[in-house]
Amino acid sequence: MKKYFVLAITMLFCNISQAAVYLIDFKCDQEAYKVFATMTLEELDGEFLEGSKKLARYHDLTTGNGIVIVEADDPTLVIEFANGWSEVCESAIVPVVDDKKAMEILTR
């Protein structure tokens, strides 16, 4: 349900005719990190669907928390990526903007 709410908000507030940036805030259990550790960087990057691109991924290995910054033409691509880890990770997807876009929005 949460995923569909985020998708609806994204479509309302983001210009989905061009690529947008999304922050995935995640918390993974130890099983996820066991799987993650067996993968190559190429395999990890290959998990992002065509039309989406990982900009950055950071981990707090002490808590299992982390973030992924993804650029995507379509928000459903980001949801599909996060869903691939949903058995071992909880995640929240939030559309984000850079300073320039934030200023455009805030000064309207």
PLM feature spans:
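N-terminal signal peptide c-region/cleavage motif recognized by signal peptidases
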Residues: 14-16
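Positively charged n-region of N-terminal signal peptides that target proteins for export
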Residues: 1-4
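Conserved, structured core segments of small domains
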Residues: 19-108
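Conserved catalytic core of nucleotide polymerization and phosphodiester-bond processing enzymes
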Residues: 10
